[in-house]
Regions:
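N-terminal interaction/assembly modules
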Residues: 1-104, 108-111, 115-127
Length: 127
C-alpha cells in the first residue's frame, strides 16, 4: 500500500473516531487488515495521543462561522495538523494531501477552505 492509500486509511480512522471513539487501535487495525501498515498505526496512534493539542490548534484558528465544520473536513484537518506538528511530515506535503482528500471526500470547493485554514495555522506558527 502506498503512502497516499495509507493516509486515506488514517483519515477514515480519524473520521470513525469522531463518530465512535476508538478504544482498541490494534483490534481496529486487525479487523481492517491493516496490522502491517506501520504508517497507519503510527499516524492514528499519534492522533489519538495528541488529540487535545490538535483540536486546540484547529479550534483556535477558526472563526465563529468555521467552527461548524463537517466531520469530514474536521477529520482531514486533524490528519494534516497531526502530520505537521507531531510526525514531522513536511508542511507542503501534508497540506497538499489534505487538499486532495478534500477534493475526493468533500463538497466541490471545500478544498479551498482546507488550504486556507491549514495555511493560516502554519503562518501563525511560523512553520
Amino acid at each position: 500500500m502506498n503512502r497516499v492509500e495509507q493516509r486515506e486509511w488514517v483519515f477514515k480512522l480519524i473520521y470513525q473516531d469522531s463518530i465512535s471513539k476508538i478504544e482498541d487501535i490494534d483490534k481496529v487495525l486487525e479487523e481492517l487488515d491493516l496490522t502491517d501498515e506501520d504508517f497507519v498505526r503510527m499516524s492514528i496512534s499519534s492522533f489519538l495521543e495528541n488529540f487535545s493539542s490538535i483540536d486546540d490548534k484547529l479550534t483556535s484558528n477558526l472563526d465563529s462561522k468555521r467552527k461548524r465544520l463537517s466531520k469530514v473536513l474536521r477529520s482531514i484537518l486533524y490528519l494534516s495538523i497531526n502530520e505537521m506538528y507531531f510526525m514531522d511530515i513536511p508542511v507542503s506535503v501534508s497540506i497538499n494531501e489534505a487538499v486532495n482528500l478534500a477534493k475526493k471526500y468533500s463538497d466541490e470547493d471545500d478544498y479551498k477552505l482546507v488550504n486556507s485554514i491549514l495555511g493560516s495555522i502554519v503562518r501563525k506558527d511560523g512553520k
